[in-house]
Amino acid sequence: MSTKWEKLEGNVGVLTIEVDAKEVNNSIDAAFKKVVKTINVPGFRKGKMPRPLFEQRFGIESLYQDALDIILPKAYGEAIEEAGIFPVDHPEIDIEKFEKNANLIFTAKVTVKPEVKLGEYKGLAVEKVETTVTDEDVENELKSLQERQAELVVKEEGTVENGDTAVIDFEGFVDGEAFEGGKGENYSLAIGSGTFIPGFEEQVIGLKSGESKDVEVSFPEEYHAAELAGKPATFKVTIHEIKTKELPELNDEFAKEADEAVATLDELKAKLRTNLEEGKKHEAEHKVRDEVVELAAANAEIEIPEAMINTELDRMVREFEQRLSQQGMNLELYYQFTGTDADKLKEQMKEDAQKRVRINLVLEAIIEAENIEVTEEEVTAEVEKMAEMYGMPVDAIKQALGSVDALAEDLKVRKAVDFLVENAA
């Protein structure tokens, strides 16, 4: 087999591949063995039709497509390996010659992984992140904990205030007509949560239990139900009950309720401070890692093929669909609620997809430039770490991974980012 690679404009090129006649004949033989099993001919058992009779009746050309299906993948795979190229999309195959007892000649037009011209990636200036935890930070965390431990109690007197929960009946009308989904009874509405249409909750503030009011609002222009989008509406609202948050007293008992591992409020505050310090340190480390990667990517010169962006977009949509399924939703419902579709979703994701592809290509180039490798021991250590994290046997982790090659590549990327951080200014 012979292979010739011709680079065209951009990231596109053409492989011209010639396969020996012997391989061609072998593929035709294999195609016959496959096809003859499906043919019933009087006088012969199924699959036992003689080759000469088959060729006389159907013509040898009837085997060519099946033969090509057999020979092309192998020939193309060997050709890209021989040419040392990395296609990022399906090839455009053009058969120039295919017949028995002759060499197969075909071309494959392919888009290949782009060349990355690295810019400055050592000594990158990154902003230092403040990790000091103040007394105010601790108090705010304590207040958040107190809020989470709060109980809702009925407000016997007074009116609805921001932060209260109003138990309401409501019915909405557009142009004097009730609409589907616009009615609810004994609905607990947290005031200030932004759950309802903009302007609704603010008009409930100041009402007393037992009071009714017509709330005038307009549906947002981008509202998911197209028949309501942008239209004014009137909601008839009745307040049944007002509930307010009753915060627990900050004392040792509260501390023990909040965290069984502490005995006093002071111990709880100390633990909160430690957690905040660890959180800020972790956040700072992530920020620095993200920043050096983005700077290195921005400094590089790359002409990214559209095929790579589309592949990444497909991956991102699959990831998004998985997250939706975990929330009991699917893409069709999401499109319905948001008034969007697959094309609009991909358009929203496109910038992030371009960024992901650029970063991946730059990190791969840095790995190559700095000869970054991972050892078998490092891969084994990572597998053991995963086993401990998930509470699974090491063999089960290996079986779940299938191959550790992808894990090894992930470790290389991690090392590349470590290198950028260690060499930052």
Swiss-Prot record:
The keyword Chaperone applies. Keywords: Cell cycle, Cell division, Chaperone, Cytoplasm, Isomerase, Rotamase. GO terms for biological process: 'de novo' cotranslational protein folding; cell division; chaperone-mediated protein folding; protein transport; protein unfolding. SUPFAM superfamilies: FKBP-like, Triger factor/SurA peptide-binding domain-like, Trigger factor ribosome-binding domain. It is found in: Cytoplasm. The keyword Cell division applies. InterPro entries: PPIase_dom_sf (IPR046357), PPIase_FKBP_dom (IPR001179), Trig_fac (IPR005215), Trigger_fac_C (IPR008880), Trigger_fac_C_sf (IPR037041), Trigger_fac_ribosome-bd_bac (IPR008881), Trigger_fac_ribosome-bd_sf (IPR036611), Trigger_fact/SurA_dom_sf (IPR027304). Its EC number is 5.2.1.8. This is Trigger factor.
